[in-house]
Amino acid sequence: MRYEQTIDILKSQRHYFTHRAHLEIEEKSRANYVTNVDKTIENNIKQALHTAYPHINFVGEEEAVNLAYDYYWLLDPIDGTQNYIKGQYPSMISLALVEKGAVVYAVIYDPYFDVLYTAYKGEGAFQNGSPIHVSTGKMNKAIVMVGTAPYTRNLTDGTFKVAKSIYEHTSDIRRSGSACYDLVQVATGRAEAYFELFVHSWDYAAGLLIVQEAGGVVSDMEGKSLNEMKVGTTSILASNHNIHHELIQLIEANV
């Protein structure tokens, strides 16, 4: 089955990003925010998905999480909420279709530039319909995206120790504030890797499949598979195959 209607559904929310709305901001925990726009976009997409695909369950970041369904949509309405609040780029919409724990279809939408990243399992990854592929870059020439998960300050020392070590062994590091953005940078070859010590399934589900279908590899920081969506949090490392093992060694030596 194809899911082309999801593209129009996600694109229909673009105006929330291109025209600033009145924001009501709630702090769920330290530096972990949700806005009325997060909730509105999630509800809009939920209702549209139910109309288009009534047989598929729905799980969103801003609702109670239940990943026990055999078949469900997994949505992050605004990945990069702090950026959105501050009027900074990037923020993205992430939607994954999960079947028996595995992502089988993914779409990430960049509403600021009207760019879609899509993947069906086993069919490759695409940017606005054109095939994308991870880079073949080596460690000393690599750009690595770094996520800091600012609402988990107990991981601060480990995160920045790893980031420093990676910086010393690569060309440079980047910090965007959006896991989806970081993952599509890897998938398109604009960066060689991305790591973060604390992410939820909705943060990375769509990006995981897109990176894999673009020829990359995704694991936790110990090299274990993240292919099964689970409740809770995990570390994540996405890269081209060339530098994955080297990065795992650097991370393990510094966390």
Where are these regions (language model features)?
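Residue-level signal for inorganic ion chemistry
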Residues: Y16-F17, D38, L49, T81, ...
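Acidic beta-strand-loop-alpha-helix segment within the catalytic core
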Residues: A96-L183, L226, T233-V255
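Conserved acidic residues
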Residues: D70-Y72, V104, A142, E192
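N-terminal subdomain of lithium-sensitive/metallo-dependent phosphomonoesterases centered on the IMPase/IPPase/PAP
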Residues: M1-I78
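Glycine-rich active-site/cofactor-binding loop and its immediate structural neighborhood
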Residues: W73-F113
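Conserved beta-strand termini and adjacent loop/short-helix elements that scaffold enzyme active sites
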Residues: K28, E61, S176-S178, M221
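Oxyanion/phosphate-interacting regions
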Residues: M1-R2, I7-D8, K161-Y167, V184-V255
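Residue-level detector of anion-binding/catalytic polar loops
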Residues: H55-N57, D172, E192, V217
